[in-house]
């Protein structure tokens, strides 16, 4: 019995999906999404939680917002950021769980070792 092969993705969808994974390849952006997955937050709180400067976090939030991965709303003088797409929350959670494992860290052998 053969396993069915799915149809190839349309080039534009493939490009957009690759761009999303590219954005998530920066550990700071991944950490920001991880934190926002558990609730909304402002830049200062995210900066403190990530150990990054407010300017750095603002820069990464702008990229995430432009890509549609986070949204923002104004509360008085501050911007509050949040993730309202359950698919993004699930994607980040699945990636984290994929790498979270037993207490012993995984070791990877270098090629040719």
Feature-to-residue mapping (PLM):
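Generic alpha-helical secondary structure signal
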Residues: 25, 63, 85, 102-103
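Functionally engaged cysteine thiol sites
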Residues: 34, 38, 42, 63, ...
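Amphipathic alpha-helical dimerization/coiled-coil segments
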Residues: 1-16, 86-113
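Beta-hairpin "wing" of winged helix-turn-helix
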Residues: 65-75, 82
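N-terminal helix-turn-helix DNA-binding core of bacterial DNA-binding proteins
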Residues: 11-55, 79-87
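Residues within the DNA-recognition helix of helix-turn-helix
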Residues: 60
